[in-house]
């Protein structure tokens, strides 16, 4: 039983933006934004990334603005 539980040890998640002491997330910073979306274009939730709620809201707003200005695609492929 202990070997099964050892397999599911979770590492402590930390907020990347707090560690970098980032104040605001900008929609023009595509390198930062692209780390928070998957290939299909969906925003990765904070329960997976460990991002704090304040920065997750800023990140979602920046991604939506970048999509609106065609800096990021809405989906992976349009056919």
From Swiss-Prot:
How does this protein assemble? Part of the 30S ribosomal subunit. Forms a tight heterodimer with protein bS6.
Q: Name one Pfam family in it.
A: Ribosomal_S18
Which chain positions lie within coiled-coil regions?
none
Under the GO molecular function aspect, what terms does this record hold? small ribosomal subunit rRNA binding; structural constituent of ribosome
The record's keywords, sorted A to Z, are: Ribonucleoprotein, Ribosomal protein, RNA-binding, rRNA-binding
| SUPFAM superfamilies tied to this protein | Ribosomal protein S18
Mind listing the GO biological process terms from this record?
A: translation
Record-stated family: Belongs to the bacterial ribosomal protein bS18 family.
- This protein's gene is called rpsR
**Gene Ontology CC:** cytosolic small ribosomal subunit
Matching NCBIfam families: S18
From the Swiss-Prot or TrEMBL record, give the protein name. Small ribosomal subunit protein bS18
The protein's job, in short, is:
Binds as a heterodimer with protein bS6 to the central domain of the 16S rRNA, where it helps stabilize the platform of the 30S subunit.
